A protein has these predicted regions:
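P-loop NTP-binding core
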Residues: 1-260
């Protein structure tokens, strides 16, 4: 089997539907037969909630980073969950030598059957996000269709560049995703134009449409692919683009096309 590829999914701030993107992208990839591990690296634990993992589930990613558990021991139904204890662990890591390498070292022991790992980064560009970028092969940046979308992506790109230059020279930008956009509005269309003018083909062709259905599916811990298949088609298209930008997934792309 090819080497596992890791994607850090990040945004400059919260509210960009980043966690929904990780949840649904993981689901779409799994349905295409891609063995996918999701990691919740946000102390708020929203991804864990979305996957219906109990808040008291143990061990968590905090235990992995603190050296109390291995990555394999912390997997709950293809997810390594998080809770508020991760905030304490982040503070602890701040005084540790080689703190930026902690997650990469831990994931070196992850089960080899996983072909892809998706990391849901916290909505800040601090130590946990840096750990994710150092552990990752690719970065996927999400942006909401707002006035400051371009500025937020540029700030996230700066952190990606710093991680690449100082700690992870192999890190590549997988793409920029315009998330939760209403393309009927002028500001959504302008946000997409500005992103494409600035970042060109690195912006995914797929735009994720905004809908209250995403909040409903999260509340029910149910994938949007099942809750609203018409909206889920956006994520099937995005998964296809992601696989197209990664080496070694031609067969999975074919399976995904049949799902659509």
């Amino acid at each position: 089997m090819a080497t596992t590829q890791t994607i850090a999914v990040l945004s400059q701030k919260g509210g960009t539907g980043k966690t929904t993107a990780v949840r649904t992208l993981a689901d779409a990839l799994r349905r295409a037969g891609v063995q996918t591990l999701a990691i919740d690296l946000d102390p708020q634990g929203n991804l864990s909630d979305y996957f219906d993992v109990p808040p008291d589930a143990e061990p968590t990613i905090a235990d992995v980073l603190a050296g109390r558990a291995s990555a394999a021991e912390a997997i709950h139904a293809d997810l390594i969950p998080a809770n508020l204890s991760l905030a304490e662990t982040e503070l602890m890591l701040g005084g540790k030598l080689g703190r930026e390498l902690t997650l990469r070292r831990a994931l070196a022991q992850a089960p080899s059957e996983y072909e892809l790992i998706l990391i849901d980064c916290p909505p800040s560009l601090g130590l946990l996000t840096v750990n994710a970028l150092v552990a990752a092969d690719h970065a996927l940046i999400t942006a909401e269709a707002q006035y400051f979308a371009l500025q937020g992506v540029e700030q996230a790109m700066e952190v990606v560049g710093l991680a690449r230059d100082s700690l992870n020279p192999e890190l590549q930008l997988l793409g920029v995703l315009l998330n939760l956009a209403d393309m009927r509005t002028v500001h959504s269309r302008e946000a997409l134009v500005s992103l494409r003018e600035r970042f060109g083909e690195r912006v995914f062709a797929t735009v994720i449409r905004s809908s209250i259905a995403y909040a409903e599916s999260a509340e029910r811990a149910k994938s949007i692919l099942d809750h609203r298949p018409d909206l889920g088609s956006d994520y099937l298209a995005l998964a296809g683009e992601v696989l197209e930008r990664l080496p070694g997934f031609k067969e999975a792309r074919g399976r995904l096309a049949r799902l659509g």
